[in-house]
Regions:
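Extended, folded cores of ATP/NTP-driven motor/assembly subunits in large transport
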Residues: 1-255
Length: 255
């Protein structure tokens, strides 16, 4: 699943009526730009046969594919979720958070499930397409979540300038890193590259704690093979869980 999100523009201060009118215009513009970005993405992914999730009619009423996706992300069950106007409920299992694991209560369809979340502590020097394919060979159920929030040109340049100044002040001898930063600055300034904040987590599921610990160890080993240092979330377990859901960027503990 791939989700596009758009952060609405901040409303300007002013009289109540003018603010409401500006909000309405802004919503229309944001929706138009989101639709345009969606069309562009669907066209770019056309060889893979993507389709836009929506609602569908059944003899039992109207059902929502977006809500089914969120429910699948929540508890790993891909099931029909009815859509009712003014209601967007898709959760029927209680989630509890412990020291380094979470628990989804059982229900009539599924038994109790345990889960743990790993986040990226350190990235490899270089990345490439297909680098995460080795995770597909890990024999455990998992949810891999990634997000990328684009950064405007000036904030990106400002961050790189700050890092370069700190390196010079500390007399850092990492010459190759300094060269890469200078090259990256040039690419961003010339519009050849964009920068942003990347978020990457892996949630593993298991029936008991022993199986869960084994799954975490196997995933960490697979990450180490590709140069990624993964850390099992403890204090940030709950925000890491909610950060998997689209639009919850404010919960991301590591990016």
């Amino acid at each position: 699943f791939l989700t596009l999100t758009r952060k609405p523009a901040m409303a300007r201060a002013g009289f109540m009526g003018a603010k409401k009118q500006w909000d309405a215009v802004s919503r229309v513009r944001d929706r138009r730009e989101l639709d345009a970005a969606t069309d562009s993405l669907l066209a770019a992914l056309q060889p893979y046969g993507p389709r836009l999730l929506g609602a569908y009619e059944t003899p039992g009423g109207l059902f929502s594919e977006p809500l089914e996706f969120l429910a699948f992300l929540f508890d790993g069950e891909l099931r029909p979720v009815p859509f009712e106007k003014g209601s967007a409920s898709f959760v029927d299992r209680r989630v509890s958070f412990g020291k380094d694991a979470l628990e989804l209560s059982g229900n009539s369809r599924s038994p109790r499930t345990l889960a743990a979340i790993l986040s990226v502590k350190e990235y490899p020097p270089h990345t490439a397409a297909g680098q995460l394919d080795s995770l597909l060979r890990v024999p455990h159920e998992m949810v891999i979540s990634q997000s990328f929030a684009f950064m405007d040109r000036q904030p990106a340049l400002s961050r790189m300038n700050t890092v370069l100044r700190r390196m010079r002040a500390a007399d850092d001898e990492a010459l190759s890193l300094r060269r890469d930063l200078v090259q990256a600055k040039d690419d961003v300034a010339a519009g050849r590259a964009v920068f942003g904040e990347h978020h990457f987590t892996i949630m593993t599921r298991a029936a008991n704690f022993e199986a869960l610990d084994n799954a975490v160890a196997d995933v960490q080993a697979a990450l180490t093979e590709i140069g990624v240092i993964g850390v099992r979330e403890e204090a940030a377990l709950e925000p890491s869980f909610w950060a998997q859901f689209p639009g919850n960027g404010q919960y991301i503990p590591r990016k």
